[in-house]
Amino acid sequence: MNIEVTQIIINQVYSKIKEYYGKGSLDYPKLELHKDIYARLSGDEEAEGEHSTTSKAQYDDETNVIYIYYPNMVNEEDVIRSIIHEYTHYKQDHKLFKQYRDMYSYNENPIEIEAHKNEEDWQLFI
């Protein structure tokens, strides 16, 4: 999906997602669109790595930003699910992130289970 279409979807749904799920302990997170996770982290726009084609979105609790990797978005549903998933992480207790990551596999992590469950609400925002 290209950056323009992704941005249109974000413009249509993000305020609804914020209203539905409410505000967390931090200000509402900004959303930023990026081509690649490695390019974003390195500052080199051409950088790629093993997760370049699979990373869809990421919430960074230190910067309070949701990063969307638009080339990996398949369709509108994918964009909405990704925003909901990362917004759920914004709302969660950030102190538990590392603790749970050390205790559980990704699929057994209660933080990830909640985020995946919330993704099922995606049709509410169309």
Regions picked out by a protein language model, each given a short descriptive name:
Residues 1, 124-126:
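Short intrinsically disordered terminal tails
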Residues 85, 89:
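Histidine-centered divalent metal-coordination motifs
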Residues 38, 73-74, 122-123:
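Short, solvent-exposed loop/turn segments at secondary-structure junctions
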Residues 24, 28, 98-99, 126:
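Secondary-structure transition/capping residues
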Residues 77-81, 92-124:
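Post-HEXXH active-site segment of zinc metalloproteases
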Residues 66-83:
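Short pre-active-site segment immediately N-terminal to the catalytic Zn-binding motif
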Residues 2-66:
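Auxiliary, metal-adjacent structural segments of Zn-dependent hydrolase domains
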